[in-house]
């Protein structure tokens, strides 16, 4: 889980590498493009990531400036991945005891 708020941006990203692909996307872009970049490609990136890595990913974000909103989503996502893959101790990081 990576969650943060700034002056005008709120975002939350939850990630689970549990072997099933699922994307919950609650982000509404108010522009089709940021410069030459189609904003719809942001969701496409995360959907493709979920499919290829078989993870559950939930992204909720809102804000005014679409460029900064996309940056905030990717930053929260990167923090989430860093926490998810960090090795701590020797125990298996699973409530079921297996991965």
Description of each model-found segment:
Residues 20-24, 34-89:
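Mixed-charge, glycine-accented linear interaction segment located at domain edges/termini
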Residues 1-5, 9:
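Single conserved hydrophobic/aromatic residue that forms the stacking wall/gate
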Residues 1, 14-15, 23, 57, ...:
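Generic detector of leucine side chains in alpha-helical contexts
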Residues 25-33, 90-99:
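Solvent-exposed, glycine/polar-rich loop segments of beta-barrel outer-membrane systems
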Residues 3, 14, 46-48:
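A generic local secondary-structure boundary/capping motif
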